[in-house]
Amino acid sequence: TDDDIPMNEGCLKPITIILPDDCMLQAQYPAAVIAGNVETSQIVTDTLYGALGVMAAAQGTMNNFIYGNDTHQYYETLCGGSGAGPDFDGCDAVHTHMTNSRLTDPEVLEWRYPVLLESFEIRDGSGGAGKYRGGHGVRRRTRFLEPMEAVILANHRIVPPYGMAGGDDGAVGRNWV
């Protein structure tokens, strides 16, 4: 294909996906559908890119991190690595697919909320190795300065993001309390 064509309506032509009734993408009551748009969309996008040979799996999750107490509440999505492609490395520490958002600047986060961002760094070695390397994820350590409840909704904690064209899988994510 010619990758140098200008953006036009043909580039945005939708595809039709035919699904069986009562599957993960067409859940029927009383199936649990929490985070149906956030986490499922990441898996669907990675699956489509993989099937088309466009790129290996990205972090495959929005890493939805929610915490708070009666006074303060905060919700953020944490970045990770993007998948490598047939002729390019993945990017480190980026939001991918549906996430497409920015993190709050650490100074603003600490000013607005009773938290201390102790570290935020690239997790070296977490991107899948290969001729073209998958992007590395991150390590983020947050200290609560007041009692808080916290929840993380994330994928790829057991099954790693898949590699492509002989490349290794990426590392699974980890959550520590």
Model regions: which residues?
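Glycine/proline-enriched, intrinsically flexible loops and inter-domain linkers
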Residues: T1-V177
